[in-house]
Amino acid sequence: MKTLLLTLVVVTIVCLDLGYTRICHKSSFISETCPDGQNLCYLKSWCDIFCGSRGERLEFGCAATCPEVKPGVNIECCSTDNCNPHPKLRP
């Protein structure tokens, strides 16, 4: 009887949705689970003094709200897992 009860408890815990967390790219090839409350992924890009030789600077991450757009900075926000890949790695 105890085994049956323990089995039911384990199955219940496994089947419960204990809260979903977003997974976003943190770099070109690494993804991480976002902290609670941060359900958006973003990709921020901008040019610095090396833009001509190295290309745009990129910042990947998670956010609760889409970061504020500033002059010279492009920001893309999305709300599905790993939706913020490196621009050259997009399908």
UniProtKB/Swiss-Prot annotation:
It comes from the Eukaryota. The keyword Disulfide bond applies. Disulfide bonds join 24-41, 34-62, 47-51, 66-77, 78-83. Residues 1-21 form the signal peptide. It holds the Pfam family Toxin_cobra-type. GO terms for molecular function: acetylcholine receptor inhibitor activity; ion channel regulator activity; toxin activity. CDD domains: TFP_snake_toxin. Keywords: Acetylcholine receptor inhibiting toxin, Disulfide bond, Ion channel impairing toxin, Neurotoxin, Postsynaptic neurotoxin, Secreted, Signal, Toxin. Gene3D superfamilies: CD59 (2.10.60.10). Expressed by the venom gland. One of its GO terms (cellular component) is extracellular region. SUPFAM superfamilies: Snake toxin-like. It is found in: Secreted. Belongs to the three-finger toxin family. Long-chain subfamily. Type II alpha-neurotoxin sub-subfamily. Binds with high affinity to muscular (alpha-1/CHRNA1) and neuronal (alpha-7/CHRNA7) nicotinic acetylcholine receptor (nAChR) and inhibits acetylcholine from binding to the receptor, thereby impairing neuromuscular and neuronal transmission. This is Long neurotoxin OH-57. It comes from Ophiophagus hannah (King cobra).
